[in-house]
Amino acid sequence: MSDLSVEMPKLEINNPGDFPSPLISYIKNDPTFKELLDSNNYKELYSYVSNSSTVTGQLTHLLYSLGFDPLKELTFVPRNFLSSQHYPPTYVTIPDNIEYLDVNSFAISDLTTISLPANLRYIDRFAFYYTPHLQSIEFRGTKEQWKKVRKIPDWISGASITNVKNIICKDGKVKL
């Protein structure tokens, strides 16, 4: 296992037909996007594309394909981070520096298992919206710490709530 937070198949960058067209349009035509990509300022880069869920998810896929781990440089999981990515990252480990999950962080993805840090403070709405393959949410803190995490209504919703019944904490389970 690598030390990247998200494991997913690599994009075949040498084959233009396999490269996602919405993202390639940003790369080719948007000087601000290119400048932010070159700067490795992940906070600004994700903020810049946050209104396009497809591009945001494709950006995440590109960065991990190139061996970059943006989550290690941020304190939050960006909006639409894995959105519309149907390459099953079966297990995602959110690094300890992450304090909150933004809107739609993992929405509409093939995520199956996620491990959340003990210092997580906030989960925004639809963070786990329509993740039909999600089977397990692990929290690396205690049940008491989990209860203190501020969770906006509908933080887990759609097909996600069908499979996940409990949060697995280090000292036991908490029912959803």
What are these regions (language model features)?
Residues 1-18, 25-76, 85-100, 109-122, ...:
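Structural signature of tandem-repeat unit edges
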